[in-house]
Amino acid sequence: MKDVPAFLQQSQSSGPGQAAVWHRLEELYTKKLWHQLTLEVLDFVQDPCFAQGDGLIKLYENFISEFEHRVNPLSLVEIILHVVRQMTDPNVALTFLEKTREKVKSSDEAVILCKTAIGALKLNIGDLQATKETIEDVEEMLNNLPGVTSVHSRFYDLSSKYYQTIGNHASYYKDALRFLGCVDIKDLPVSEQQERAFTLGLAGLLGEGVFNFGELLMHPVLESLRDTDRQWLIDTLYAFNSGAVDRFQTLKCAWGQQPDLAANEAQLLRKIQLLCLMEMTFTRPANHRQLTFEEIAKSAKITVNKVELLVMKALSVGLVRGSIDEVDKRVHMTWVQPRVLDLQQIKGMKDRLELWCTDVKSMEMLVEHQAQDILT
């Protein structure tokens, strides 16, 4: 049994800058006001006075451990995460988190947060297989939670870092975007916003099967790169989103300086040519989706004899649906994969909708004026 009052009294005298807080903790503990005490501790563990040393470990051992069974499980794990950061031996930290997981097993969210922290530690020490297993385990639990909770962002942060480590661009792109969807961008330092925007942009360009850039283009995190030496990435992403092959080639002087992009130039060209075909299909009216080989070749910057191969690739990966008329050298498109649209694409849809409304109005007037002839 720890002498809690003695520890709190000693802490008050040894840390005069936080004496009032220590006194408040003692008062709440004595009165057994566990909820108020939990809130006070949650705030206190983030105090700059604990930035160095092992103060949080001592706080846990001599104080928090005495009433942790009365603390809300999720709040307890939130507190424990701060304590763990002061443990220099990762194995000690892992053991501590495993014990904590047992203590909070009554709460799924608390267990998820605890397992996520365990996964983060395993990733830091390079145990990729254990990290992968933890992610798979936690993801299954996460899918059973109703809505988006406070633990989602921590999980997606872990999973995206894991995919970044193993070089899985597509999965990193997906989960890094999910992370940003769970946090307030204003809570991230500008430097972190810029780094996340840059790595996300590269992952989107390099990710196999990633053809949807609209969500990233509409996210405010990308604006952190505007008017910086990485502005070219925004321009390149917009070029890809609109399938502008010529714009992509013009920007080569910028993206060509980035080693990963330069090394995958052929792959990037194939991707933007597929996006070009998607954009051509999307911008055509539904009743006029006959594309000639010459039109496709001109926009995609390829020779006519390579058009059929490009269309077959787009059909095989499910980007478009349609048929190829080899005799007339035409492609009839019936469907294009839905994507998150940027503002320019939305404007294009608005213009086409207005044109359609005009056509409907004209037909209405025609029927009205010639109704007698039609009926007789």
UniProtKB/Swiss-Prot annotation:
Residues 171-338 form the PCI domain. The modification N6-acetyllysine is found at residue 298. The keyword Transcription does not apply. GO terms for biological process: meiosis I. Keywords: Acetylation, Proteasome. PROSITE patterns: PCI. Pfam families: PCI, PSD13_N. InterPro entries: PCI_dom, PSD13_N, PSMD13, WH_DNA-bd_sf. GO terms for molecular function: endopeptidase activity. One of its GO terms (cellular component) is proteasome regulatory particle. PANTHER family: 26S PROTEASOME NON-ATPASE REGULATORY SUBUNIT 13. Component of the 26S proteasome, a multiprotein complex involved in the ATP-dependent degradation of ubiquitinated proteins. This complex plays a key role in the maintenance of protein homeostasis by removing misfolded or damaged proteins, which could impair cellular functions, and by removing proteins whose functions are no longer required. Therefore, the proteasome participates in numerous cellular processes, including cell cycle progression, apoptosis, or DNA damage repair. Belongs to the proteasome subunit S11 family. Component of the 19S proteasome regulatory particle complex. The 26S proteasome consists of a 20S core particle (CP) and two 19S regulatory subunits (RP). The regulatory particle is made of a lid composed of 9 subunits including PSMD13, a base containing 6 ATPases and few additional components. This is 26S proteasome non-ATPase regulatory subunit 13. It comes from Mus musculus.
